[in-house]
């Protein structure tokens, strides 16, 4: 998603550790994870999240709250695809840029649906709006696939939304990093 950042990281590892960096999507992970989508169109962060949760017996929906809000569907050891929605902070920034009278707001969880001022109304709209988006997408995946899933939240705003679903949700803060480490251990066997 951020090629310039990846390029800087790649150069850093080459300069200071004399080693090459590879993206997960470009590595042979076929015995670890079956990828059922076009590899060129999936982010390595999403693959890392999938690798982190695979256990050959459970189905997972991983919701990653980052620049985008990603929903990834993993069945047993297969990455089946997902959903990409706009990230909350990105959407907030865009709203204040495009609507000059809307202030730039630091997102906070709202307990009241009806806001009493602009800031509380924005927080309410984003909290309840994204809660509905998350709930609807997860239920739509379940309905369409006719499977049961364990739900994992990760990323910066994961804890804020944990209790906004009726389904049981587990928070895994280091999911992406754990997936990269799991892939590295697999590749270095």
Describe each model-derived feature in a short phrase.
Residues 1-61, 77-189:
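Nucleotide/phosphate-binding catalytic cleft detector across ATP-hydrolyzing
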Residues 62, 69-74:
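Short beta-strand scaffold segments in enzyme catalytic cores
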Residues 43-44, 67-69:
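A general structural signal for short secondary-structure boundary/capping elements
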């Amino acid at each position: 998603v951020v090629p310039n950042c990846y390029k800087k990281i790649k150069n850093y590892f080459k300069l200071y550790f004399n080693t090459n960096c590879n993206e997960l999507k470009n590595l042979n992970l076929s015995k670890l994870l079956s990828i059922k989508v076009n590899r060129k169109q999936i982010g390595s962060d999403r693959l890392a999240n999938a690798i982190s949760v695979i256990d050959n017996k459970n189905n997972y929906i991983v919701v990653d709250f980052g620049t985008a809000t990603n929903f990834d569907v993993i069945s047993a050891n297969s990455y089946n695809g997902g959903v990409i929605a706009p990230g909350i902070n990105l959407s907030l920034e865009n709203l204040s840029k495009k609507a000059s009278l809307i202030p730039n707001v630091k997102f906070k969880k709202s307990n009241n649906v009806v806001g009493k001022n602009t800031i509380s109304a924005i927080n309410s709209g984003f909290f309840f709006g994204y809660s509905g988006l998350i709930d609807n997408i997860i239920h739509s995946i379940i309905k369409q696939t006719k499977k049961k899933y364990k739900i994992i939240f990760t990323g910066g705003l994961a804890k804020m939304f944990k209790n906004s679903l009726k389904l049981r949700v587990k928070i895994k803060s280091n999911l992406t990093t754990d997936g990269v480490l799991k892939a590295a251990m697999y590749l270095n066997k």
